[in-house]
C-alpha cells in the first residue's frame, strides 16, 4: 500500500491511497464467502454455490461494495498512520479505480486536527481569591441550618406574607374556560418560591384564611404548553390555611440536633468555620485553575474545524441527556417544557463547545511543548485512589476502566494545569 498526503486550505487535505491488487482480490474473495451464505440456488445447498456460477449469474461487480466495505477501513487506517495525520471527522471517500486483478486507487478528503500556535502560557497573571471566613459568614451558615430545621406551624391570625406557606384551592380559566392542569385542592404553596407563574404568588400575599380572590396573570411567551403561552388567565383562589416557619432556638440542643459530632453551639460554630475555610480554599484553587487555563487558551492561535465543534456538541447533548434521565426526564419532554428543539439546544451550547475544544487543544499542545509524561506508578496510584473513593476493589476499577490509556491522558491534562498554576504570576 502507498499513501500520499496533500494539504489543502485550512485543516483539510487529501490522501491518495493505492492498495495492491492481491489485497483487492483477497477482499473480493472475502466478500464472496460472506454473500454466498445468503443465496439459495436450486441444485445447491445454501452457501455452496460455486464461485464461477455466481460470477456468471450475478457478475463479479456485485461483490465490489462488500469488498470495499472490507478493504477501505483497513487501508484508510494504515494510510493515516503512514501520513502521520490526526483526522477529526469522517473522510469523504472517492473511489477512482476498483476492479478484480488491479490495484485499488481512492482518495480521502480529510479534516485534521489543527495546528496550535501557543501564546503566552507561563507567568500568567491571575487574581488572588479572598479565602478569609468572617463571623458574618459563620452566622449566615448557622442561619441556613436554622432555616432547614424550621417547622411549619399554623398561623392563627394575620395574612399571608412572603416566606409563608399558603394552603389553597385554585382553578384557572383562559377566555372564560377552565383548562387542563389548571386546578388544585389543598395545595401547599410556598410564597416567594417562584413555583407558580410570575405574578401569582405576589397576589396571594395579604389574604387571610378563608378569603378568596381572582388572581389575574399572563402565561409566559415561552410556556411549555403552547395553547396557553402568552395568554392572560384568571385563577380563582381560596386560602384555607396559612403556615409560617418557626425557627428553633440557637442553643446547645440545636447544635447536637444539627450535627451529632458536636456537643455545644460553640463547637458547631467552630466546625462551620473550618468547613467554610476548606470550601473557600477549594473554590479559590478551582478559580485559579480555570483562570490560567482560559488565559492560556485565549492567548493561543487556532483555526478550529467546525467538525470538532460538532463532535463536542454531540458529546455535550449526550451528557445533558444523561443528566435529564437521572431526573426522570428525557430530551423530548425537555423540548416540550422549554419550547425548544435540538437545533436551538445546540445553538445554546455552541459557545461552550468552542471553548471546550479550544482548551483541550491548548492543553494538548502544552503537554507536548513541556514533555509532560505520566508514569505507570502514577496511574496505579490514581486507580488505588479511585478504588478507595468508590469502595471497590482495585481489580474492579481496572475492569471498569478497560484500558488505563484514557486515565493516563486525564492525568497528563491535570499535570498541564498544575504546570500553568505553578508558573502563574
Curated annotation (Swiss-Prot):
PPIase FKBP-type domain sequence ranges: 163-248
Gene designation per UniProt: tig
Domain notes: Consists of 3 domains; the N-terminus binds the ribosome, the middle domain has PPIase activity, while the C-terminus has intrinsic chaperone activity on its own.
Subcellular localization, as worded in the UniProt entry: Cytoplasm
Taxonomy of the source species: Bacteria, Bacillati, Bacillota, Bacilli, Bacillales
Reactions that this protein is recorded to catalyse: [protein]-peptidylproline (omega=180) = [protein]-peptidylproline (omega=0)
Xref: PANTHER family: TRIGGER FACTOR CHAPERONE AND PEPTIDYL-PROLYL CIS/TRANS ISOMERASE, TRIGGER FACTOR-LIKE PROTEIN TIG, CHLOROPLASTIC
General function of this protein: Involved in protein export. Acts as a chaperone by maintaining the newly synthesized protein in an open conformation. Functions as a peptidyl-prolyl cis-trans isomerase.
GO cellular component entries: cytoplasm
Alphabetical UniProt keywords: Cell cycle, Cell division, Chaperone, Cytoplasm, Isomerase, Rotamase
Protein name: Trigger factor
Single annotated GO MF: peptidyl-prolyl cis-trans isomerase activity
EC number(s) recorded for this UniProt protein: 5.2.1.8
One Pfam short name: Trigger_C
InterPro entries xrefs: PPIase_dom_sf, PPIase_FKBP_dom, Trig_fac, Trigger_fac_C, Trigger_fac_C_sf, Trigger_fac_ribosome-bd_bac, Trigger_fac_ribosome-bd_sf, Trigger_fact/SurA_dom_sf
Biological process, per Gene Ontology: 'de novo' cotranslational protein folding; cell division; chaperone-mediated protein folding; protein transport; protein unfolding
Protein family: Belongs to the FKBP-type PPIase family. Tig subfamily.
